[in-house]
């Protein structure tokens, strides 16, 4: 399946279709969208965002704790879309504040 991913970035909103078996960060890059990242393994906070609507699966990540995930935090490098989803990107400073 594919879902519509909407990224709300400081430069504006980007939308694309993302297969449910491709990480959101990887597919955004294929679409030419530049997002922050570092480890690409779900073990840091460089790519952190906040889910504003919809659902993701980020069980491959290790950096976020359950409370942060419940609050809507997401690591785009290890997140699969599970529905149409809206994510506010570039949130590392807010997450680690």
UniProtKB/Swiss-Prot annotation:
<dbReference type="InterPro" id="IPR036010">
    <property type="entry name" value="2Fe-2S_ferredoxin-like_sf"/>
</dbReference>
<comment type="function">
    <text>Ferredoxins are iron-sulfur proteins that transfer electrons in a wide variety of metabolic reactions.</text>
</comment>
<feature type="binding site">
    <location>
        <position position="39"/>
    </location>
    <ligand>
        <name>[2Fe-2S] cluster</name>
    </ligand>
</feature>
<keyword id="KW-0813">Transport</keyword>
<feature type="domain" description="2Fe-2S ferredoxin-type">
    <location>
        <begin position="3"/>
        <end position="93"/>
    </location>
</feature>
<keyword id="KW-0408">Iron</keyword>
<dbReference type="GO" id="GO:0009570">
    <property type="term" value="C:chloroplast stroma"/>
</dbReference>
<keyword id="KW-0001">2Fe-2S</keyword>
<keyword id="KW-0934">Plastid</keyword>
<protein>
    <recommendedName>
        <fullName>Ferredoxin</fullName>
    </recommendedName>
</protein>
<dbReference type="InterPro" id="IPR012675">
    <property type="entry name" value="Beta-grasp_dom_sf"/>
</dbReference>
<keyword id="KW-0411">Iron-sulfur</keyword>
<dbReference type="InterPro" id="IPR010241">
    <property type="entry name" value="Fd_pln"/>
</dbReference>
<dbReference type="GO" id="GO:0051537">
    <property type="term" value="F:2 iron, 2 sulfur cluster binding"/>
</dbReference>
<feature type="binding site">
    <location>
        <position position="47"/>
    </location>
    <ligand>
        <name>[2Fe-2S] cluster</name>
    </ligand>
</feature>
<keyword id="KW-0479">Metal-binding</keyword>
<dbReference type="GO" id="GO:0046872">
    <property type="term" value="F:metal ion binding"/>
</dbReference>
<keyword id="KW-0249">Electron transport</keyword>
<keyword id="KW-0150">Chloroplast</keyword>
<dbReference type="Pfam" id="PF00111">
    <property type="entry name" value="Fer2"/>
</dbReference>
<dbReference type="GO" id="GO:0009055">
    <property type="term" value="F:electron transfer activity"/>
</dbReference>
<dbReference type="InterPro" id="IPR001041">
    <property type="entry name" value="2Fe-2S_ferredoxin-type"/>
</dbReference>
<feature type="binding site">
    <location>
        <position position="77"/>
    </location>
    <ligand>
        <name>[2Fe-2S] cluster</name>
    </ligand>
</feature>
<feature type="binding site">
    <location>
        <position position="44"/>
    </location>
    <ligand>
        <name>[2Fe-2S] cluster</name>
    </ligand>
</feature>
<dbReference type="InterPro" id="IPR006058">
    <property type="entry name" value="2Fe2S_fd_BS"/>
</dbReference>
<comment type="similarity">
    <text>Belongs to the 2Fe2S plant-type ferredoxin family.</text>
</comment>
<dbReference type="GO" id="GO:0022900">
    <property type="term" value="P:electron transport chain"/>
</dbReference>
């Amino acid at each position: 399946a594919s879902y519509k991913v909407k990224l709300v970035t400081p430069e504006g909103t980007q939308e694309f279709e993302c297969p449910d078996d491709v990480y959101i960060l990887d597919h955004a890059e294929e679409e030419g969208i530049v997002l922050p990242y570092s480890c690409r393994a779900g073990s840091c906070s460089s790519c952190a965002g906040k889910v504003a609507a919809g659902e993701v699966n980020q069980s491959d990540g290790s950096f976020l704790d359950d409370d942060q995930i419940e609050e809507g935090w997401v690591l785009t490098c290890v997140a699969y879309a599970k529905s149409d989803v809206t994510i506010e990107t570039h949130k590392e400073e807010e997450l680690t504040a």
